Amino acid sequence: MYGVSPLLLKAVAQVESNMRPHVVNSTHTANTQSQDIGLMQINTRWLRRNLIKSLGYTEAHLYDPCTSVKLGAWVLANNFTRHGASWEAVGAYNAACTRLKGDACRRARNGYAWKVYRAMRKSS
């Protein structure tokens, strides 16, 4: 989907929600006014983006596993466009680095990418 490997999507879902489609992460709501929802833990900030908004997606859609994977693939594809086909792009799925900068951003992205890599190795 969007040119993103199904194995990568499965690994991200494993890391993000442990394959549970109804998980909600509200730990950063106070700081970001957003939540991560569903199988791929799509951040509700994505719903404010013009393309996603124009497609009519709402918070309720994020609980649907198929929609969650579709939007997760879209986010990853956009990351690959911005960062190249790299583990940094995978890390950016979880660490957008709007607040983290420099080495702190790189550490967060590398740590997340490593988790996804290990999940991919386990499932293959």
Each language-model region and where it sits:
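Catalytic glycan-binding domains that act on GlcNAc-containing polysaccharides
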Residues: M1-S124
